[in-house]
């Protein structure tokens, strides 16, 4: 830690300014009030598109960084309000329209539902049989599982949460108005990164985790222990009363009584004194390090989860005391940056990270780019953990929920990562000043961009040719009836030896490199089969030639996505083709009528193209996951202990040819969605077709030029004039950029909704 002389500290001073800027609906009610040109109202139909494009582009409203910062800050509260309203809706559906109590009583036979369709023209057919006499639409969001984990035992508690979330939404809206219109932070408050780090690390993440650990220990632990005992058929006794159902479980506030908790976890009876005396072992019964899964629920041990949150809290509270604020001790982010000079051989940047601190504290786009890339990656990591280390009770045997959560977190991650590239490019165009980045690391990367992009392009060609080449070879050999010459586990075997090594290393860790763990980190890593209610919750995942091949397709598609996005960022300001690109802005269709062959070079166009490859890449990821799990993990356990998998282990043989992917995965698993009419999954059949239409509709925007439509519009306007019904607002064709934006939006919406219908209709029937 850098200990500095006392004078390096700064006196605390007010970082907030009283503002007299009343929130008036007269202003808000005027469309385009934020832009002088838009405020005049529409003359042509282009106005409404520009309104959408610029409403949230605060940079375009004002160049005052403090004003932009305040608007972003205020908008965050608005965003939180929307999130609380959305949460309230989820809680309300659970309280009012769900079979939550029925599911709690028998989670392995009752399916979760929180929506009942009203009969108007026959759509009550969508209310499927959920078990225990309840008919509704099956939900796949994992809400019931997470609510049980929180310790919620009744619909009444969900209704209280629904009301509480609305109250929070009101508070957030109030805060958003207050901190912009009444009392707004000054620019230096937004740029005080050390204070922000301390508060976010120690407060938000540290104390947040600690308070959550408190909830887990005092509410979740007792409730889940009692619920697990009921589900195992061995109910526990509290104060002489047998807890035989969820209704018998004491309410959360009753667990304030330490004696009640101590009957379940004696360690809690030792109170706080054991903590201060160093006798931490006393807490070993409720802060555990077991590893593996709870055999009753197929989920991580709640005592492990509580321990995890205590540990996270300690780490982040310590981390939140590392940065120098008003006292003269701790790290300075600026000094850390400027202390990094780069490796003289590998990366000679004489000025290291000089200038980056200023860039990151004056460019919100640069800050957002880093955060989106990190959060997107984190979302994709969460997707992997949902099945490898299922945290919530019975979620691992609810296969529709498992596919739903994996797919959701993968898509979200992809969109956030593309967003990271978008904002990095905007930062380069709008906020980057070359004079402030001479020979620092960013400047050196830009100078080396040709080498970086050409090498990355070579990697993409190599990966694409070889990974796809393996499939082409296999299809050819299978077509010619030569299975002995195919790449497969039986013929020419290519084993993923590094992945298998990692699996073995994890499996061997418990009791050796992790001496205190009782079981491995995940059953997926060469563990054992965990069955709950006769269904597989987790099992070791065998990896072979088929996995090796599709993994390299993943490597190929991810690298192409990175190539497009990184090229957009590195060439956002200039290129050999268009040296003055920075003057043309973030989005432009072509470099003027005088220069042909300069279309799709703007940074925006790279984001546009990157989205297609992101979609392409992640479609294969979710298809791989869905098929692999159904083939090799999920299924029912027979009386002799053997497992009957959903697709009978066909992945290893079928996934090694393109024809196999089409025939044995896409076509075979589309049976349910195509045959869904007349059943409770028929909505997915209609959605499957409707989403295909939306996807196809996008091609109309992507495959045609603006001039075609402008010509058509002018003839239609002529006809209107003839009939004396000409509109006051002049119709205009979409601009080239607007057409691409509409096209990619429908392409992604159609593609994702098609996949949603395909997955759901299949897994709800067979899972």
UniProtKB/Swiss-Prot annotation:
The entry marks the following residues as binding chlorophyll a, namely 700, 708
Coiled-coil region(s) at which residues?
none
The UniProt function text for this chain reads: PsaA and PsaB bind P700, the primary electron donor of photosystem I (PSI), as well as the electron acceptors A0, A1 and FX. PSI is a plastocyanin/cytochrome c6-ferredoxin oxidoreductase, converting photonic excitation into a charge separation, which transfers an electron from the donor P700 chlorophyll pair to the spectroscopically characterized acceptors A0, A1, FX, FA and FB in turn. Oxidized P700 is reduced on the lumenal side of the thylakoid membrane by plastocyanin or cytochrome c6.
| Full protein name | Photosystem I P700 chlorophyll a apoprotein A1
Source species of the chain:
Synechococcus sp. (strain CC9902)
One Pfam family from the UniProt entry?
PsaA_PsaB
What is the top EC class of this enzyme, as a single word? oxidoreductase
InterPro entries linked to this entry: PSI_PsaA, PSI_PsaA/B, PSI_PsaA/B_CS, PSI_PsaA/B_sf
Q: Where are the transmembrane segments?
A: 72-95, 158-181, 197-221, 305-323, 364-387, 403-429, 451-473, 548-566, 606-627, 681-703, 741-761
Q: How does it sit in the membrane?
A: Multi-pass membrane protein
Annotated gene: psaA
């Amino acid at each position: 830690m850098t200990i500095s002389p006392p004078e390096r500290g700064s006196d605390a001073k007010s970082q907030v300014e009283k503002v007299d800027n009343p929130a008036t609906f007269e202003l808000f009610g005027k469309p385009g009030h934020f832009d002088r040109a838009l405020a005049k109202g529409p003359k042509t139909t282009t106005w409404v598109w520009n309104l959408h494009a610029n409403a949230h582009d605060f940079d375009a409203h004002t160049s005052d960084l403090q004003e932009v910062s305040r608007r972003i800050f205020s908008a965050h509260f608005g965003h939180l309000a929307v999130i609380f309203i959305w949460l309230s809706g989820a809680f309300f559906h659970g309280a009012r329209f769900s079979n939550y109590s029925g599911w709690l009583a028998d989670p392995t036979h009752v399916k979760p539902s929180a929506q009942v369709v009203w009969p108007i023209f026959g759509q009550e057919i969508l209310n499927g049989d959920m078990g225990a006499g309840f008919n509704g639409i099956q939900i796949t969001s994992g809400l019931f599982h997470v609510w049980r984990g929180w310790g919620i035992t009744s619909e009444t508690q969900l209704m209280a949460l629904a009301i509480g979330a609305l109250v929070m939404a009101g508070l957030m809206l109030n805060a958003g108005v207050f901190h912009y219109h009444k009392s707004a932070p000054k620019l230096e408050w937004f740029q005080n990164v050390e204070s922000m780090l301390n508060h976010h690390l120690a407060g938000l993440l540290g104390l947040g985790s600690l308070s959550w650990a408190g909830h887990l220990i005092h509410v979740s632990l007792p409730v889940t222990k009692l619920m697990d005992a009921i589900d195992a058929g061995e109910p526990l006794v509290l104060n002489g009363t047998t807890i035989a159902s969820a209704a018998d479980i004491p309410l959360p506030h009753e667990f304030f009584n330490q004696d009640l908790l101590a009957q379940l976890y004696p360690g809690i009876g030792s109170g706080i004194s054991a903590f201060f005396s160093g006798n931490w072992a006393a807490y070993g019964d409720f802060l555990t390090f077991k590893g593996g899964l709870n055999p009753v629920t197929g989920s991580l041990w709640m005592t492990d989860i509580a321990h995890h949150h205590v540990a996270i809290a300690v780490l982040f509270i310590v981390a939140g005391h590392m940065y120098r604020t008003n006292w003269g001790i701790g790290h300075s982010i600026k000094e850390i940056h400027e202390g990094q000079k780069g490796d003289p051989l590998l990366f000679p940047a004489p000025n290291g990270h000089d200038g980056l601190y200023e860039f990151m504290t004056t460019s919100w786009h640069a800050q957002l780019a880093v955060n989106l890339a990190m959060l997107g990656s984190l979302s994709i990591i969460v997707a992997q953990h949902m099945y490898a280390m299922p945290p919530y009770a019975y979620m691992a045997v609810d296969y529709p929920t498992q596919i739903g959560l994996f797919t959701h977190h993968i898509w979200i991650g992809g969109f956030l990562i593309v967003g990271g590239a978008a904002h990095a490019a905007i930062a380069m165009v709008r906020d980057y000043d070359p004079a402030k980045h001479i020979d620092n690391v960013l400047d050196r990367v830009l100078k080396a961009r040709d080498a970086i992009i050409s090498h990355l392009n070579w990697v993409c060609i190599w990966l694409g040719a070889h990974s796809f080449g393996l499939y082409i070879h296999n299809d050819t050999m299978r077509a010619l009836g030569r299975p002995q010459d195919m790449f497969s586990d039986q013929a020419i075997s290519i084993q993923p030896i590094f992945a298998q090594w990692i699996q073995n290393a994890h499996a061997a860790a418990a009791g050796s490199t992790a001496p205190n763990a009782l079981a491995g980190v995940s059953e997926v890593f060469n563990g054992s089969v965990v069955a709950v209610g006769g269904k597989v919750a987790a099992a070791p995942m065998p990896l072979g030639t088929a996995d090796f091949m599709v993994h390299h397709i993943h490597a190929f598609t991810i690298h192409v996505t990175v190539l497009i996005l990184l090229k957009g960022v590195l060439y956002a300001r200039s290129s050999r083709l268009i040296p003055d690109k920075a003057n043309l802005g973030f989005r432009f269709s072509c470099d003027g009528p005088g220069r042909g062959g300069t279309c799709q070079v703007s940074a925006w166009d790279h984001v546009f193209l990157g989205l297609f490859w992101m979609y392409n890449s992640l479609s294969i990821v979710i298809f791989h996951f869905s098929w692999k799990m159904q083939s090799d993990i999920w299924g029912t356990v027979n009386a002799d202990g053997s497992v009957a998998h959903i697709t009978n282990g066909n992945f290893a043989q079928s996934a090694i040819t393109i024809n196999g992917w089409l025939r044995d995965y896409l076509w075979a698993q589309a049976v349910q969605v195509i045959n869904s009419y007349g059943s409770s999954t028929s909505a997915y059949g209609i959605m499957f077709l409707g989403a295909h239409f939306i996807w196809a509709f996008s091609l109309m925007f992507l495959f045609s030029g603006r001039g075609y439509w402008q010509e058509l519009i002018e003839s239609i306007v002529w006809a209107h004039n003839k009939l004396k019904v000409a509109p006051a607002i002049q119709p205009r064709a979409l601009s080239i950029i607007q057409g691409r934006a509409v096209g990619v939006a429908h392409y992604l919406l159609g593609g994702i909704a098609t996949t949603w219908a395909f997955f759901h209709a299949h897994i709800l029937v067979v899972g």
